[in-house]
Amino acid sequence: MFNLKNFLLSSSLLFSVFSSPVFSNPKVLKVGAIPDQNQDVLDKRFNLFSKELSKQLDVEVKYIPVINYVAAVTGFRTKDLDLVWFGGLSGVQARLQTPNSIVIAQRDIDKEFKSVFIVNKNLELNSISNIKGLKKLKNLRFTFGSENSTSGRLMPEYFLNQAGVEIKHFKGKKAGFSGSHDATIALVNSGAFDAGALNKQVWENNLKNNPKRTSNLELFWITPEYVDYHWVAQGDLENRFGEGFTKQLKSVILNLDINKKSHKQLSLIHI
């Protein structure tokens, strides 16, 4: 349902962020990312990433946080963002709206990405071995992540549909939209929802590093593989930063190495 108050708030926040003086400086490389996790996690990750880019490219790089997936796509379309970490769906949306934009990099795991379905332990539902078992989620309170998330909504809904489960089959004939993968974990763990779907990497990271956040959860099913996250850049960066800049930018990103201590801190490589 359209919410005018939220739309106006989002619009005003977008205006205040994208009207900052940094956006009038053509020599600043502006980096963005879809907000698929808690903001403090994203801020740490992409500020470190921006510092690494700045160091290796010898240009000023600024990370610009956005409030939602739509803002990331909009910021890229209006050229207020130069380089954005998109998911599969949001990346397609951004490129369709931004002529000459290009995909410049992708992690190896993103070629074979997966989502997971999780359930609250109180349901006492056993994990399933094939897609047909998703029918067990009918009549439950179910939440996706963001509506524009590939791993948190698009692909999970696709697999649900393949199993004959539609949104109308959930309790209340609707699904929730938590806004992010971390929020999905929190909502199902608390019992606010019975089940949910999210990014497999975020799930595994929380299992390892935040066991309290997953204490009431069970893994229900892991999806088949699909293509997801990638870096998308504006097609005119060389007009601002010089000939060969895009190739150099691509090389820096692709040469990030998890085995290097300084690069390992950029959890973007493996999360």
Place the predicted regions along the sequence by residue.
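Conserved small/polar residues in nucleotide/adenosyl-binding loops
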Residues: 269-271
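A ligand-binding cleft/hinge motif common to bilobed small-molecule-binding domains
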Residues: 85-98, 161-162, 187-190, 194-215
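Short helix-initiation/N-cap motifs at beta->coil->alpha
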Residues: 63-74, 87-89, 168-186, 227
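Ligand-binding cleft/hinge of the Venus flytrap
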Residues: 47-58, 146, 150-177, 205-212
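Extracytoplasmic "Venus flytrap"
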Residues: 28-46
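A bilobed periplasmic-binding-protein/Venus flytrap-type ligand-binding module shared by bacterial periplasmic
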Residues: 115-126, 227-241
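A conserved helix-loop-strand patch within extracytoplasmic ligand-binding domains
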Residues: 107-163
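Short beta-strand->loop
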Residues: 100-110, 171-174, 206-226
